[in-house]
From Swiss-Prot:
Cytoplasmic side stretches: 1-29, 89-103
Keyword line: Cell inner membrane, Cell membrane, Electron transport, Heme, Iron, Membrane, Metal-binding, Transmembrane, Transmembrane helix, Transport, Tricarboxylic acid cycle
Essential cofactor(s): heme
The gene coding this protein: sdhC
Family of this protein: Belongs to the cytochrome b560 family.
Protein name, entry field: Succinate dehydrogenase cytochrome b556 subunit
GO MF annotation list: electron transfer activity; metal ion binding
InterPro entries with a match to the protein in the record: SQR/QFR_C/D, Succ_DH_cyt_bsu_CS, Succ_DH_cytb556, SuccDH_FuR_B_TM-su
Gene Ontology annotations of biological process type: tricarboxylic acid cycle
Subunit record text: Part of an enzyme complex containing four subunits: a flavoprotein, an iron-sulfur protein, plus two membrane-anchoring proteins, SdhC and SdhD. The complex can form homotrimers.
TM ranges: 30-55, 68-88, 104-124
């Protein structure tokens, strides 16, 4: 009897750590840092395109009063502040500070709280 590769692959056991792994704050923030970097690239590109178009047609400026656009701008500003704060955290890591588990957790939560506060200060 010959088993196909797919049958053998389907019957292979999964490593137990994959089923019980819990994301840590540092891994979550690392993933979010990369995601916000990509999102900011596209957001700045769209914003530049919108500003160029608004120079030629004032209807694009009126589009900014839309509620959905304001929500998107708040989200982009949060992503920017988060990316900024986490980038500062990475700069401290680059010079060798904050590598203990306690420091990583504290600075991670500080990044989240500071980015929320800075976004609120900008929009309130």
């Amino acid at each position: 009897m010959t088993k196909t590769k797919q049958e053998i692959y389907n019957k292979r056991p999964t490593s137990p750590h994959l089923s019980i792994y819990k994301l840590q704050i540092s891994s979550t923030l690392s993933i979010l840092h990369r995601m916000t970097g990509v999102a900011l690239f596209f957001a700045v590109s769209i914003l530049a395109w919108w500003l160029i178009l608004s120079k030629y047609d004032n209807n694009y400026l009126q589009f900014a009063n839309c509620c959905i656009i304001k929500i998107c701008l708040v989200a982009v500003s949060y992503a920017w502040f988060y990316h900024l704060c986490n980038g500062i955290r990475h700069l401290f890591w680059d010079i060798g500070y904050g590598f203990s588990i306690k420091a990583v957790n504290i600075t991670g939560w500080c990044v989240v709280v500071c980015s929320i506060l800075l976004t609120m200060l900008l929009w309130v």
